[in-house]
Regions:
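N-terminal beta1-alpha1 ligand-phosphate binding loop
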Residues: 3-28
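Active-site rim beta-loop-alpha module in soluble metabolic enzymes
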Residues: 130-202
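N-terminal glycine-rich phosphate/adenylate-binding segment common to multiple enzyme folds
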Residues: 56-99, 109-112, 195-208
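Eukaryotic N-terminal targeting leaders
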Residues: 1-3, 241-244
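Short, hydrophobic alpha-helical segments
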Residues: 122, 188, 230-242
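Short, acidic/small-residue loops that bind anionic groups at enzyme active sites
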Residues: 95-122, 214-233
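N-terminal beta-loop-helix "entrance" segment that forms/cooperates
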Residues: 37-63, 168-174
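Short hydrophobic segments within beta-strands
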Residues: 8-10, 38, 128-131
Length: 244
């Protein structure tokens, strides 16, 4: 049976949604998933670059997803929802809370929680590469306070966050690829000794294979958080369905 998923871009940049869709259509079979896409309304910021814009986007998106039962984006019309922002985005928790109150079986995941849990299971050194520097303390605090397992902490597998010092919308520009690759080599690999590098922003979507090829000799695993998030979400949906 086909699963019905909503991918939520919580900012108001339609170009980011288009980029997400292009990446997803290359990796996820249409035969197994029916995927719809939501872009934040005009009251949502054009890009999310910290805690303030995260909260702003949550307040803009949540009513659209939960208040109007006739809307094509009403959350209960989907089996699962992926919040496509790499942060401890408050929309993830808020949607889960609404679903729990209404006793809905919809599964909700974000990019940060799903990718960190994947790394916890793999059990190898990992770090994050992100956009602007403001994200470093935010992501480090979120990961360390909420998402690490005891085993990951005991083995010191979590190595921290590195910034490209680029804004979200600039990450996808071909002109910046070499700069991003140089930072990964110097900081994530040499300095932090990472075996897995999480591409910690939706703006990196689609760069996984290009970076893997660039660092083929090093054997680095690059984690496309959209792909990992979707695969985990699909597994959750199938498990819920198996109980019926």
């Amino acid at each position: 049976m086909v699963v019905n998923i909503l991918v939520v871009n919580p900012n108001s940049s339609k170009s980011m949604t288009i980029s997400l869709q292009e990446t997803i259509e290359k990796t996820i079979s249409k035969e197994s998933c029916e995927i719809s896409y939501f872009t934040g309304p005009n009251t949502s910021p054009p890009q999310i670059d910290g805690q303030e814009t995260s909260v702003q986007s949550m307040k803009a998106c949540l009513p659209v997803l939960t208040d109007d039962k006739g809307s094509i984006y009403y959350f209960q019309k989907f089996d699962g929802i992926l919040i496509a922002c790499f942060s401890d985005h408050p929309l993830v928790t808020e949607l889960k809370d609404v679903a729990a109150k209404e006793k809905s079986n919809v599964s909700v995941v974000g990019l940060l929680d799903s990718s960190i849990q994947y790394c916890n299971l793999v059990g190898r050194n990992f770090s994050i590469i992100t956009s602007n520097k403001e994200w470093i303390p935010i992501l480090n605090a979120s990961v360390q306070s909420k998402f690490l397992t005891g085993n990951t902490i005991d083995k010191n597998l979590w190595k921290g966050t590195v910034s490209t010092d680029l804004q979200v919308l600039a990450l996808h520009s071909p002109d910046n690829f070499q700069q991003i690759a140089d930072i990964i080599r110097d900081e994530n690999l040499r300095k932090l000794d990472s075996e897995i590098v999480i591409l910690g922003c939706a703006g990196f979507s689609g760069l996984q294979n290009k970076l893997a090829k660039k660092f083929e000799k090093e054997g680095t695993l690059f984690l496309d958080t959209i792909e990992v998030g979707l695969e985990i979400l699909i597994t959750m949906i199938k498990f819920v369905r198996s109980q019926k």
